[in-house]
Amino acid sequence: MLRGNPLGDPWRRPLWVYVPPGYDAEPDRRYPAVYILHGYLGHLEIWRNRAPFRKTLIEAADQLFADRAAPPAIVVYVDAWTSYGGSQYLDSPGTGRYHSYLCEEIVPWVDRHYRTLAHRDHRGIAGKSSGGYGAMITPMLRPDLFGGLASHAGDALFEYTCVAKFLGCIRFLRAYGGDIQRWWKEFQERGVLAKPADRSLLILYGVSACFSARTDGTPEIPFDPESGMLIPDVWRRWLDVDPVRMVSGHAEAMRSMRGIWIDSGAADEHHLDLGAQAVDQALARAGVRDETKRFELFPGGHGDLDQRHLLSLAWLAQRLAPSR
């Protein structure tokens, strides 16, 4: 699905598949599967990065299942890095077919090569930040494939969480005459995040490639770089893929989920706690039952999400396990 992508990024990708303790000892047993999505500027290797006094998610998941603290599950770690730093797990002429890659290539491959319970009721998806965004929208678009989700500070409520970031980008772009293409050319020549503007402008440019690329693949930013005014036609494309707004159009899909976990740090630096609240409220308006969803604002910020994955993994494994 990624062959011939517009950025020339590798179309062959690593894929990590974790199998729980006892997998080889019970050759006739099949397992639910949970797909894990990394955030923007993230990549597959982050899942085995070691932090002080903390296990990696892979180690923690292994301990979770070894201790029988949750029903055993297969855990699939997906790579969706691009030269812009991420894909938002969407199909776009600016980045490539990452939604299709996940749904049409990875899921069938895993089902063919591992003993999964190959049904949407036993398949979940989870992620943090932009990975949390992907975990929210993918089951909306493909409820035939995914029956549960967990989003940790996923991107949502764009008029607050995105527009707040645009203000700094407008100032940064003054040094480039308001021309983000000029910045991009310079950044490519440097090839490293070295200037204060780089991270913000890379995310703006990359997410524009995901949400509002022109047909030729050129990212189109959603505001006038001089006045700062939003460009209505472009901004509408962003709002169309805001999970808060998507819920109403995919209400039946959301009501069909076996479990929906939405959380964020209450002090999230990107105000994604507001996005999480708005998604939870949209789910309630769509008729998702309280017993189906779990919502929490926990003490902490955007850098405190890794510990949340283990909690939602245990919860999803329970929700997606077959009835005994």
Kindly label every feature range from the protein language model:
Residues M1-R324:
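Non-catalytic cap/lid and distal C-terminal segments of serine-dependent acyl enzymes
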